[in-house]
Amino acid sequence: MMNGKIDIKNLTLDDLIAFLAGKGKERYRARQIFKWLYQKDARSFAEMTDLAKDLRRDLEETAVISDLEPEAMEVSRDGTRKYLFRLEDGNTVESVLIPEEDRTTLCISSQVGCAMACEFCLTGTFRLTRNLTAGEIVNQICAVRRDVPVRNIVFMGMGEPLANLDNVVKALKIILHDDGLQFSTRRVTVSTSGLVPEMERLGREVTVNLAVSLNATTDEVRDRIMPVNRRYPLRLLLDACRSYPLPGRRKITIEYVMIKGLNDSLEDAKRLVKLLSDISSKINLIPFNEHDGCSFKSPDQGAIDVFHSYLLSKHFTVITRSSRGSDISAACGQLKGKLDKNVSGI
């Protein structure tokens, strides 16, 4: 609620149908409003000219259309863009747009801060402040699309998406709906550090791609760098990956942050092959992006090449991700801090 009014951007189409039914309005009105919000980017009810004036007046009295505008934006040497959004309560989140030859990918946030405390991640050094609403999640996409076209959406920004599953699922239903933002399920990926029960629920409620931040091949190492592993160790996590419902020939993305001397050896590569032998997956190797919040180091190029080559020799689909946006602290594991501090003059 905002000033006693409902934020209409927090409503799925079914929610909006129910909201309007309480006003005695027809179901098709909800579809009209949805299209105005997400396909015509309406930011006021007055713009919705195919709605009766009395309905527009009623909506203005009982509802608001929330919005986000970037407070700041930085552009990396490689074209990556980082957007800072200030929320209604003064908190901030960041989104990152990654341009590639044939597409653009928008990395969006789902929480202010993060409670997962992954040792290699700068965002994890900021305590969780709160969950984002569905509207705050969706509005990141709406705002960036006013600047540049967006083809892919990844929930890999600030926060653990599955720790805010109610609002993330609502946002996904808006993102995927034909009357909403109209993204194909193939173009939307949700990343998790490994919240097993929530992985199962996500698979039941929506059809999206799944990325799992694995980063270790033994429980001993994963316990150290990802506290979530103490609750859901590798055995449970990999079982959840095996049972996650993906249509057709799609694969789960396994994200593997390579850290020098910790998880970058040939033996790690061999264990990874065994762990994933019966899971339909593709592997993203992510050389660790060094930052002031952590003493870990990036792996040597030779170690990366050996690791990559071994996975290829075992017929895995594998990509070694280049570091995008590291000069503006927009690379994997670097979100939150620098841009906000620059704006605030700290």
Swiss-Prot record:
Chief location category: cytoplasm
UniProt-annotated catalytic positions: E94, C332
UniProt xrefs under PROSITE patterns: RADICAL_SAM
EC main group: transferase
Binding site for S-adenosyl-L-methionine: G159, E160, S191, S213, L214, N215, N289
Domain of life according to the entry: Bacteria
Location(s) in or outside the cell: Cytoplasm
InterPro entries reported for this sequence: Aldolase_TIM (IPR013785), Methyltransferase_A (IPR040072), RlmN_N (IPR048641), RNA_MTrfase_RlmN (IPR027492), rRNA_lsu_MTrfase_RlmN/Cfr (IPR004383), rSAM (IPR007197)
Alphabetically ordered keywords of this record: 4Fe-4S, Cytoplasm, Disulfide bond, Iron, Iron-sulfur, Metal-binding, Methyltransferase, rRNA processing, S-adenosyl-L-methionine, Transferase, tRNA processing
CDD domains according to UniProt: Radical_SAM
Gene Ontology BP, a term: rRNA base methylation
SUPFAM superfamilies reported in the protein's UniProt record: Radical SAM enzymes
Disulfide cross-links: C107-C332
Pfam families reported for this sequence: Radical_SAM (PF04055), RlmN_N (PF21016)
Function according to Swiss-Prot or TrEMBL: Specifically methylates position 2 of adenine 2503 in 23S rRNA and position 2 of adenine 37 in tRNAs. m2A2503 modification seems to play a crucial role in the proofreading step occurring at the peptidyl transferase center and thus would serve to optimize ribosomal fidelity.
Protein name: Dual-specificity RNA methyltransferase RlmN
Lineage: Bacteria, Pseudomonadati, Thermodesulfobacteriota, Desulfuromonadia, Geobacterales
